[in-house]
């Protein structure tokens, strides 16, 4: 009797889809989309649109939202001067600044694995501010130059913090503590510039140091927008690279991921974004601290969602500036005063909760 053995049927192993994700097909390719993060992103987009319309409506003279929509859609309106020329440029600058701070905070906190690793806490914003204020006291006040000086100051401060914190790896707690030390030192340098400079220039620089959107127009909005558009490809890469950074170092090394270079690239992008935003509006404190952690809690994801963090940062800045304009009208408050009033208690809460990093935990392999 002859027995016939059947050849085993080879089957391609099915890809395991993580819980909470949906596979979205786009042409021949596909990608995973976190359902809750997508819903939160849509909700934040709607919220940002609503806050923006309210921002353009409320002022010395109230303009109905219907007229605001008419102006934004390009239709003729008697309120075109107030909405399109006076309020819209300032709102756009605030929106772009919030987007930049939101992404910058998310990237730096992801690399450091520490919710306190915010650009305005670890010295990056202070470095950008010190060089910018120093230039202002020596007569450089052109917005065509100040953002680039701000980027240079932020990158230099970040490089110093990175070098001093590196001990065979980037220890999260050491990174934050050394950054705080540099932030204090750089604030002292900024104060020195303010005391040695011309009185009127020092007064202007002091307002800028609190974080202010007062007087911002299209001359500031246009270069800021183009800079952020130029950084968009890097931001898309960062959204993909976040997953590799969150891996265990041994796992990433086994998969051949150049973890050190990826982390360095993410930090550099975060520093540039924070410095550009600082150059445009001054060091608006705590936006980069608040937005990533709130976005993560809203989406309940393992990594900080970049898009949600960016949108939330924009909502925070635009809404805070709306309150800053109207709370003590006709006197305007710097937007940084409002964000600090919310961010400082949140920072205290983080420290009390003990979320300053675990001993022995590092955030860097070989760089």
Functional labels for PLM-detected ranges:
Residues 2-367:
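Alpha-helical transmembrane segments in inner-membrane proteins
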């Amino acid at each position: 009797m002859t027995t016939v053995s059947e050849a085993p049927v080879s089957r391609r192993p099915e890809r395991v889809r993580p819980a909470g994700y949906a596979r979205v097909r786009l042409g021949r390719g596909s990608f995973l989309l976190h359902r809750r993060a997508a819903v939160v992103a849509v909700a934040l987009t709607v919220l940002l649109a609503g806050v923006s319309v309210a921002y353009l409506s409320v002022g010395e003279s109230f303009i109905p939202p219907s007229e605001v929509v008419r102006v934004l859609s390009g239709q003729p309106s008697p309120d075109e001067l107030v909405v399109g020329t006076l309020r819209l440029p300032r709102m756009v600058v605030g929106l772009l600044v919030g987007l930049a701070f939101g992404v910058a905070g998310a990237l730096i906190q992801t690399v450091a694995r520490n919710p306190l690793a915010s650009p305005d806490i670890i010295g990056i914003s202070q470095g950008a501010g010190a060089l910018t204020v120093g230039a202002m006291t020596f007569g450089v006040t052109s917005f065509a130059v100040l953002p680039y000086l701000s980027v240079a100051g932020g990158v230099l401060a970040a490089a110093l913090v990175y070098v001093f914190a590196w001990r065979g790896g980037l220890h999260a707690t050491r990174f934050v503590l050394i950054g705080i030390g540099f932030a204090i030192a750089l604030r002292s340098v900024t104060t020195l510039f303010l005391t040695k400079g011309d009185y009127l220039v020092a007064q202007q620089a002091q307002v800028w140091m609190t974080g202010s959107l007062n007087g911002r127009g299209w001359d500031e909005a246009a270069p800021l927008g183009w800079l952020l558009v130029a950084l968009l490809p890097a931001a898309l890469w960062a959204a993909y690279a976040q997953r590799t950074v969150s891996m265990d170092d041994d796992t990433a090394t086994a998969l051949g991921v150049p973890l050190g270079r990826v982390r360095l690239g993410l930090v550099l992008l975060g520093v540039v974004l924070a410095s550009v935003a600082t150059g445009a509006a001054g060091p608006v404190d705590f936006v980069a601290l608040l937005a990533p952690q709130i976005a993560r809690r809203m989406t309940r994801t393992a990594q900080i969602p970049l898009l949600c963090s960016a949108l939330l940062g924009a909502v925070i800045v635009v809404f805070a500036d709306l309150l800053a304009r109207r709370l003590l009208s006709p006197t305007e408050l710097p937007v940084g005063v409002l964000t600090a009033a919310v961010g400082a208690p949140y920072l205290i809460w983080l420290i009390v909760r003990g979320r300053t990093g675990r001993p022995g935990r590092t955030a860097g392999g070989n760089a």
